[in-house]
């Protein structure tokens, strides 16, 4: 395809590093971007985002996605949802009372958080993370829900959880062997 404009800067906060971006297409033709930002939330890394309308213009300002700010939250991935909203998933250090866990936040079509930050992994012993920093994925489903998949280093397996359109976990977890 042809470019619809020039290169643009997503982040407005430019102190330290802003890295590991992810982008999701939204139902209204816009898109949302998330990334990891060093020290912006007072911790090692935090997860931040920005929405854009169908013309590619920023819709509102840059916003913080993670509410838990102890230690670090790293490497987000996101997906657009059937209702026009989106969900962001990331790795969080120490938040699940063990080591790294998989956490997320859902947003409505206007970019407002729906519910609170949630833990996607049900098994919390050890690490649901991988040093490759590409460990979790999320996909929106036609019914408005989503599926989260990650690598569990404890058993070297891939695991996942499915969530309803209301943001409720519909299962105890998925083990992919």
Regions found by a protein language model. Name each.
Residues 1-177:
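Extracellular, repeat-based ectodomains that mediate carbohydrate processing or recognition
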């Amino acid at each position: 395809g042809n470019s619809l404009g020039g290169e643009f800067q997503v982040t407005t906060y430019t102190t330290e590093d802003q890295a590991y971006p992810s982008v999701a297409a939204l139902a209204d033709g816009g898109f949302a971007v998330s990334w990891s930002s060093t020290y912006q939330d007072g911790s090692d890394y935090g997860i931040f985002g920005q929405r854009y309308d169908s013309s590619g213009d920023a819709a509102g300002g840059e916003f913080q996605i993670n509410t838990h700010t102890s230690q670090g939250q790293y490497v987000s991935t996101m997906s657009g949802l059937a209702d026009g909203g989106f969900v962001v998933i990331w790795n969080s250090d120490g938040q699940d009372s063990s080591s790294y866990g998989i956490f997320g936040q859902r947003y409505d079509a206007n970019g407002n958080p729906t519910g609170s930050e949630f833990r996607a992994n049900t098994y919390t012993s050890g690490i649901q993370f991988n040093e490759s920093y590409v460990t979790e994925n999320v996909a929106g489903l036609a019914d408005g829900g989503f599926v989260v998949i990650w690598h569990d280093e404890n058993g070297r397996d891939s695991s996942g959880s499915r969530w309803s359109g209301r943001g409720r976990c519909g299962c105890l977890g998925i083990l992919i062997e």
